[in-house]
Amino acid sequence: MRVAPSGGPPHHHAMIRATPPKRRLKAGTINVAPSFMRERDLMECGVWPVAGCDEVGRGPLAGPVVAAAVVLDPNHIPKGIDDSKRLTAARREELFEEIVATASFAVACAPIERIDRDNILRASLWALARAVHALPDTPKHVFVDGRDRIDIACACEPVIGGDGLVLSIAAASIVAKVTRDRLMCKLARDCPGYGFETHKGYAVPGHLEALGRLGPSSHHRSFFAPVVAARERHRALLAGASASISETSATVAVEAVI
């Protein structure tokens, strides 16, 4: 697996509101599986390699954005590839191992420093471009999930809802999701108390409670609104506790000399 390095110039950004974790489709919802049709059409026209790329982690309050780019082997495509949000964690892990064993792929992370410095959108697009650049073979065409183009030398085709339509994007969504989930579990060991291993940094009630109690960690995104609010509340609590300690110390000191 190739991992792209970080770096680049800063950009201005505004405070961001958190988004909840995306959910898998409910039972009974129509689920049209992504297909390899677009990649095959290009391949038959002599355009190859064709990559799909996707990112995970725009919405959470903590942790990096992880992007992946995948070029599937037309002769060895794992069965069951789908939008990562439609799969259980166990099935994602299984497909991850099959994809990385048969496909060409690369991942890139936009760390918390870049997210705070640039803003979440720029950091996400940067990570997507870095993942494509890190592929072992330069693609001639790239499908990217969403509406935004990325800064790459080859043809770039945004596909809204692409992780549910284009098979190589779906594969990239699985690689990015599993990689980020594993990174968040590692952060949970390095920074205990927030429950990163459970919610992966999203703004669920347990995470918000821990933020209010512990204050933000170095892995939290400084300009996301719940983090800003938690930081201010935590400072107020610390200031109140400090004032209480000072008053108690002064009382003890006075009593000691009476």
Curated annotation (Swiss-Prot):
Residues 10-20 have a biased composition (Basic residues). It holds the Pfam family RNase_HII. Residues 1-20 are annotated as: Disordered. Its cofactor is Mn(2+); Mg(2+). It catalyses: Endonucleolytic cleavage to 5'-phosphomonoester. Keywords: Cytoplasm, Endonuclease, Hydrolase, Manganese, Metal-binding, Nuclease. Its main location: cytoplasm. GO terms for biological process: DNA replication, removal of RNA primer; mismatch repair. It is found in: Cytoplasm. GO terms for cellular component: cytoplasm; ribonuclease H2 complex. InterPro entries: RNase_HII, RNase_HII/HIII, RNase_HII/HIII_dom, RNaseH-like_sf, RNaseH_sf. Its EC number is 3.1.26.4. A divalent metal cation binds at D54, E55, D145. GO terms for molecular function: manganese ion binding; RNA binding; RNA-DNA hybrid ribonuclease activity. Residues 48-236 form the RNase H type-2 domain. Manganese or magnesium. Binds 1 divalent metal ion per monomer in the absence of substrate. May bind a second metal ion after substrate binding. Coiled coil: none annotated. Endonuclease that specifically degrades the RNA of RNA-DNA hybrids. PANTHER family: RIBONUCLEASE H2 SUBUNIT A (PTHR10954), RIBONUCLEASE HII (PTHR10954:SF18). Belongs to the RNase HII family. This is Ribonuclease HII. It comes from Nitrobacter winogradskyi (strain ATCC 25391 / DSM 10237 / CIP 104748 / NCIMB 11846 / Nb-255). The lineage of its organism: Bacteria, Pseudomonadati, Pseudomonadota, Alphaproteobacteria, Hyphomicrobiales.
